[in-house]
């Protein structure tokens, strides 16, 4: 009898399925952007913006997409994961977006010269929310010479469809808004 029960349990567990993991990357909102190649001799003549690594709050430093389930509860998805670390995706989108906005400057993740502008971005919230909203918030600091610009940012967008793919697309749109606002503020000051 124990043998039959064991086989039945084994058969039932073999038939159950574990949901597949889905991997996501922020959309390439800058497709077709002018991604010029700058040689070393040309870059020495242009001002540089050094985009430092994005700093994420602790809840965002994981592979799962963060979702706020109530006014005080958060969950990190186990089946819906970032294909590449979120900080790297955000930094790459920021570099490409700023390069588009500043075509006469070198925008890079590495310092190329001693005289450069430095951009540091902290992301505290980058998630979907129970009411269909997408929240992106944090702050950034831009230093160039003796001048320092420090600004918070907060973007709240409505997710137009259900599901993680729509959430990731809306997060990408929100990040594009943050990049545009950073570029606009820098341009207005210099």
Where are these regions (language model features)?
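Sec-dependent signal peptide recognition
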Residues: 1-8
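C-terminal motif of bacterial Sec signal peptides marking the signal peptidase cleavage site
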Residues: 12-14
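Surface-exposed short loop/turn segments
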Residues: 17-34, 100-146
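C-terminal/domain-edge helix-coil "capping" segments
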Residues: 20-23, 27, 31-38, 161-190
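N-terminal secretory signal peptides
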Residues: 32-52
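N-terminal segment of the mature soluble domain
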Residues: 46-115
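Soluble periplasmic/extracytoplasmic beta-strand elements of cell-envelope proteins
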Residues: 48-53, 66, 118-123, 135-139, ...
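Short secondary-structure boundary motifs at beta->alpha junctions and helix caps
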Residues: 73-81, 147-177
């Amino acid at each position: 009898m124990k043998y039959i029960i064991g086989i039945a349990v084994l058969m039932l567990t073999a038939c159950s399925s574990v949901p597949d993991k889905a991997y996501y990357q922020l959309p390439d909102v800058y497709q077709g952007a002018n991604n010029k190649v700058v040689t070393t001799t040309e870059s020495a003549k242009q001002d540089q913006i050094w985009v430092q690594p994005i700093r994420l709050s602790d809840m965002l430093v994981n592979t799962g997409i963060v979702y706020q389930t109530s006014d005080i509860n958060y969950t990190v998805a186990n089946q819906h994961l970032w294909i590449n670390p979120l900080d790297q995706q955000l930094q790459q989108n920021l570099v490409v977006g700023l390069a588009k906005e500043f075509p006469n400057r070198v925008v890079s993740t590495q310092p190329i010269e001693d005289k450069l502008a430095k951009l540091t971005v902290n992301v505290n919230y980058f998630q979907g929310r129970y009411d269909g909203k997408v929240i992106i918030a944090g702050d950034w600091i831009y230093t160039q010479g003796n001048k320092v610009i420090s600004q918070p940012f907060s973007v709240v967008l409505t997710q137009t469809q259900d599901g993680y793919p729509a959430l990731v697309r809306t997060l990408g749109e929100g990040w594009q808004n943050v990049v545009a606002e950073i570029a606009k503020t820098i341009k207005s000051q210099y």
